[in-house]
Each structure stands twice: as structure tokens, then as C-alpha cells.
UniProtKB/Swiss-Prot annotation:
Annotated compartments: Host membrane
Keyword terms, alphabetized: Early protein, Glycoprotein, Host membrane, Membrane, Phosphoprotein, Signal, Transmembrane, Transmembrane helix
Gene Ontology cellular component list: host cell membrane; membrane
Residues of the signal peptide: 1-16
Function: Down-regulates the EGF receptor and prevents cytolysis by TNF.
Protein name (record): Early E3B 12.7 kDa protein
Family recorded in the similarity comment: Belongs to the adenoviridae E3_14 family.
BP terms from Gene Ontology: regulation of signal transduction
InterPro entries hit by this protein: Adeno_E3_14_5
Source lineage: Viruses, Varidnaviria, Bamfordvirae, Preplasmiviricota, Tectiliviricetes
Domain of life: Viruses
Keyword Transport found: no
Main location: host cell
TM regions (residue ranges): 37-57
Amino acid sequence: MKTALVLFFMLIPVWASSCQLHKPWNFLDCYTKETNYIGWVYGIMSGLVFVSSVVSLQLYARLNFSWNKYTDDLPEYPNPQDDLPLNIVFPEPPRPPSVVSYFKFTGEDD
């Protein structure tokens, strides 16, 4: 009984209108009010951008790119080399030149 009532109330608008829903090319002729098509274009494009953004974020989370994979098993640092000497002796730095520069006295090298 409930199903029959639901179907009846769903079909009342179809019977009451003069539109032929089985002919979609004539469906816009049922309405006399002018439609602002640019609003529909903006709405549809905004909806497509939103849906594609949601789908792309869902796909990005599910795909295993190399920068998203679990990387704890990789070494963080290279293994230290055991054959390096612990005391590294650097050579003596060269002596400063014995010539005195003119610019050191006057401060004009800035």
C-alpha cells in the first residue's frame, strides 16, 4: 500500500504537467521563464572542478608514488668507514707575507 502511494505521488507532477519527459529535446519548451545559461555554465564548471579535486585527492592518497612509500627500512646515513685515522694532522698554514700593505695603514681597502 505504501509503495502504491509513493508511486502515485511521484507520478502526479508528470500527469499534471504538459511536458513530455520522454522527449528531452522539447523539455526546455515547457517553461516560459527565460533561463540564465551563464549561471548554469558557472555552476556546472564549479561542480566539475570540485568533483575532480575530490577524486584526485582520493587517488593521490591511494597510489604509491616513490616519495609516499614507507621508507623506514632505508639507511639514514652512510656507514662510517673504519679505516680512517682518528688523528688527522693538517699541514702548517703558510706564513703571512713580510711586506706591509699601504691599504692596511690607511684603511682604504673597504
